[in-house]
Amino acid sequence: LSQQWAEKCARQLEALGSRVLQGPSGPKDNPYPVFLASVSQPIDLAIVFGGDGTALTAARHLAPEGIPILAVNVGGHLGFLTETSEEMEDTEAVWQRLLNDRFAVQRRMMLQAQIFQGNRTNREPMSEYFLALNEVAVKPASPDRMITSILEMEIDGEVVDQYQGDGLLISTPTGSTGYTVAAGGPIIHPGMDAIVITPICPLSLSSRPIVLPPGSVVSVWPLADPDLSTKLWTDGVLGTAIWPGQRVDVRISDYMTKFIILRENYSYYGTLRNKLHWAGARLSFTNNNRN
C-alpha cells in the first residue's frame, strides 16, 4: 500500500516538474544514503509513507541535512508522528498547498549519543554519534539468558544513581509517548525541550523517572559482568555495544527534525486522547460553565 501511494505521488510531482527519488524504507532497506549522495541540489522535501517507525528512520537520516518530512500514516498502528491518509486523499490539493506555503513546520528536538573509553579526562569519542528522535536505550545484551543490568548514571559529571533492572531510557518529549510511557515515564509536550530519564523495571522502588533541562549531559556506565556487553539502541534500532570501562554520553543534538503539518485543526491533546484511548471517568459530567 505504501508503494502504491509513493508511485502515485511520484507521477503527479514529476508532472509538476519536480525531480523525484523513490525507494523502499524498512528494517532491511535504507535508501537515504543513496538519495543524499546522488543529488547535486538540496532536497526540498521528503514524503514518507508508513508508520511512526518509518518516520523515525527518516528523521535520523534527514535531520542533519535540514530536510523537512511529510510523514503519512499508511498501515501504521499509532501514528503519533504522521499525518492521516485522509489528509492525502486529494493529493493535487496537497501539492498546491505545499507550493503556496500553506502548511506548518513542527520542529522536534533530538538526542545524540557517543561512546567514550575511561573517565572524563578522555574526551575523544570511540564512536560516531548516534541520533535519536524518540529515545536512547541502554540495555543488557545476552543471546542465551535474561540478565539484570547494573548501570551507573551521571548528570553533568555528578553521580546520581545506580540502577539495577532491565535498562535505562533517555528520551525526548517526542519519545515520551513511546517506550518511555510504557515504562512508567511522564508524558512531556513536544513543544518543550527536555530530557527524560526512565528506568526500565528497576529492582528498587525508589528509582523514579527524572526530567532534566535540555542542556544536561547524561553519562551511563555499565557495571555488569566484564565478559558481557551492554547494547545502545536508538529509536529501537541497535547502535553499538558498550563494554565495562566504557560510557555513553547522551545530550541534546544540534539537529532538529522538521515535520510538515497539513491539518489546520491539529491538536496535540486530541492526538493523545485518540492514540492512547483516553476515555475519561466512567461517569460523564456536564460543565455548564464553559461557553
Regions found by a protein language model. Give the residues of each.
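ATP/nucleoside-binding phosphotransfer catalytic cores, i.e., glycine-rich phosphate-binding loops
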Residues: G118, P125, V138, I155-V159, ...
